Amino acid sequence: MMNEDNKKVPKRISQTILNSLKGGVVPRIGLPYITVGRKNEIEALLHDVDIIAEGGASFRFIVGRYGSGKSFLIQTIRNYVMDKGFIVADADLSPERRLQGTRGQGLATYRELIGNLSTKTKPEGGALTLVLDRWINSVQTQAVQETGLEPGNPMLTKAVDQRIYAVTSAVSELVHGLEFARVLSLYYHAYVDGEDEMKMKVVRWFRGEYGTKREAKEALGVNIIITDDDWYEYLKLFAAFFRMAGYAGMMV
C-alpha cells in the first residue's frame, strides 16, 4: 500500500497498469499503487528476502485456485525486492520450457530467465548488459576514489584490472566458474577497448545462444557452451556474481 502523501500515480505507470489490466495480465510495474489486502503474505515472503540478503537461500511454493491472485502476489514481491536492490529473473514454464529436459527445454528456461533479468532501473527485463556495464563503472569509480589517480593513468588501469581479477578469481572457484570468469574478463576488456561487437558476442554466450562448442570457440575462444545439463550451475554463478557486483541478491 502507498503512503498517504504519495497517492499520485505517474502517468506512464498508470497507463501501463491500465493496459495490463485490460489485457487480463498482471502489470510488471506500479503494483504498489493497487496492492491491498496482501500484508501477511508479503511480510512472510519479505522475511525470506532478508535471509537471501544475508547470504542464505529460500524456496517457496505459492498454491491457490485459478484467479486467487498467485501471479499478482509474485509480481508484487518482484517489485518489492527490486526496490531493495535485488536482481530478479522470471520465466513461465511450459512444454517447451522446463526445469529439466534433454531437447533444449531446460536451456530454453535459462534463456528466458536471463532475457528477463530485471533491476530497479530496468524493471521490464533485458538488464544483463546494464548490470555488466554498471559493475565495471563501479569498479572504475572505486579505484579512482581509493587511489586518487586520474582516468587515463596506466596505474589506475592496473588497479582496476586487479579489482576485476579479484571478482573473476572468486567466481572461478565454483562449478563451471573458470569458463564463466574467462568470459566475464572478455566482456571487461571489450568494454574498456570499446569493442561493441565483442561485447555482444559475450552477451550471447551468457544468454546461452551458442548452439555448438565450435561456434563459441570461433567467436570467443572458449570451448564450452551452456546446455540442458548445466544451465542451473550458470544460474548459481550469476547469483554469486551479482552479489559481488554490489546487488543484494538474486530472486528467481
Predicted segments with their positions:
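Walker A/P-loop nucleotide-binding motif
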Residues: 54-76
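A short, basic N-terminal segment
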Residues: 1-58, 156-157
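P-loop NTPase nucleotide-binding core
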Residues: 68, 72, 76-249
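General secondary-structure edge motif
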Residues: 25, 29, 42, 61-62, ...
